[in-house]
């Protein structure tokens, strides 16, 4: 069944709009994060990434990393634009394993080297935006999202 994301359904929309994702494609942590993101006034937009279809990061292993969310916080200067995109992968505590360590390592390298390259040089659609990659665990997601929202 497809439906809008609310407190009783587990369906995702794009930043309060109407792109839908099937109920079984989201876990409880992702659902909680999505609901929380949707209530943040300082967010310009957020997007629930669709695994194996949308945005991905290619590390040194064969399989691509499809992060859970892309998030843009309003720029403090004008409140209309954004200067940074946050790439967020959420993980349950029971999923702290070798795969999670790999994703953290890939994201760490992305954070280290991304600032040295302008998106325009890569012909990417975000132009001159910064990008920050994060793996967030279920016991810290609220504080980490608050940090994202308040530190832009």
Annotate each language-model stretch with its function.
Residues 1-152:
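Electrostatic, structured charged patches in enzyme active sites and in nucleic-acid/phosphate-binding
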